Amino acid sequence: MTDTTASGTARVRTRFAPSPTGFIHLGNIRSALYPWAFARAMGGDFILRIEDTDQQRSSQAALDVILESMQWLGMEPDEGPFHQMQRMERYRAVLAQLQAAGHAYPCYMSVAELDALREKQLAAKEKPRYDGSWRPEPGKTLPPVPAGMSPVLRFRNPQGGVVAWDDKVKGRIEIRNDELDDLVLARPDGTPTYNFCVVVDDIDMAITHVIRGDDHVNNTPRQINIFHALGKEPPVYAHLPTVLNEQGEKLSKRHGAKPVTQYRDEGYLPDAMINYLARLGWSHGDDEIFSRAQFLQWFNLDHLGRSAAQFDEAKLRWINAQHLKAMADDALAALVAAQLQRRGVAQQELANGLANGRLARICALFKDRCDTTVALANWAQVFYADVTPAETERALHVTEAIAPALDALADALSGCEWNRPAIAAAFKQVLASQGLKMPQLAMPTRVLTVGTAHTPSVDALLELMGREKVLARLRNR
């Protein structure tokens, strides 16, 4: 029996190995989160490896998005990115090593022959597999080598015994070697295949723990056998359950998954994303909201879940709102300023707002009403740009009957000190003189100054807006 063991006291080294063939979504990035967190928790190293041997589908644009997504989330690697396409010489050397040791052999079976074999096996209700026609055996006569044909190189898989490993998520898994055929290590043009490259990379990069999606479980016994053929012990494996979308399908580009960078653009916070993704397959008791530092302190492989996790955008927004509320106002102000600058607000005006704390106070006033930084920037924008109230709210609150009171309020505000107590006193004065209640005057004031009747305290609102803007918006109605 072939078995794997933990890597003893070796320094923990994990990896994330994406293919740059499209945008990276939340299911992909979760496969980076756990190895990154485990390396950080154990004081180890996190390696980024780019599996780009599929040159027809790989692109620099896709790679840039992977790097951008990881940088935004603060999951930058200790080493890499390493590119498989830059390691071809090393792969060729190891292929030659395997062939010289009798662990690999050339196979000249054509595609047509393989197709015919597959059809025959399916007709006989057998599992389709390579039949070993070109596998050298003592006393066996191999078919004649076809003229002008380049062979594939196949791995000589053990024919007896069991390959087994203790998966940190799924428990013990055992596969009989006679269920595995001789997989292709290199194509006719000499290009090495995925399962071979992965093993060579994991050996050369001294990977101790492979934490990846459970769609790789079927690859694992084949990879373990290649490790042993090369005289190396395989790493510890942890195969993560699938992430499902809100309809219960596997989260994928085909089924509506969004790029990670889109969540950034929609106003999600990196630490909130880390929090949410961590809970999408791992738990620490009943803790739902935690910081990045807490996650890295608590994380281990023992609490990874075995069941598929389902993405829930409403839960993500709720978690984001909790992180937004807990975030320091000046840090939020910097994020909001960047968004407002992209919307055309003058850089100097924003710089002044950051320097004098005004933008931080705006964020403090509105952040409890927001679940994204985009929503918060929408509120902040009314302090820097012209406002057009919704016609329904204007018609409801800014009536001819209230016009005298609005004029009186503008007059009172033009001569008072500009702070919350003085603004509140001006309102009381006008309410008393006009015989009104606070909502009758506060609602139209809110509509005219920020475009909606539903805001925090009106005196706090007006103080932050500044006398000049407030008077202009009250009078130019």
UniProtKB/Swiss-Prot annotation:
GO CC term, one of those recorded: cytosol
One GO term (biological process): glutamyl-tRNA aminoacylation
Compartment(s): Cytoplasm
EC number: 6.1.1.17
Protein biosynthesis keyword on record: yes
Motif 'KMSKS' region: positions: 250-254
InterPro entries noted in UniProt: aa-tRNA-synth_I_cd-bd, aa-tRNA-synth_I_codon-bd_sub2, aa-tRNA-synth_I_CS, aa_tRNA-synth_I_cd-bd_sf, Glu-tRNA-ligase_bac/mito, Glu/Gln-tRNA-synth, Glu/Gln-tRNA-synth_Ib_cat-dom, GluQ/Sye
Chain positions recorded as ATP binding sites: K253
PANTHER family reported for this sequence: GLUTAMATE--TRNA LIGASE, GLUTAMATE--TRNA LIGASE, MITOCHONDRIAL-RELATED
Subunit record text: Monomer.
Family from the record: Belongs to the class-I aminoacyl-tRNA synthetase family. Glutamate--tRNA ligase type 1 subfamily.
Identification of the protein by name: Glutamate--tRNA ligase
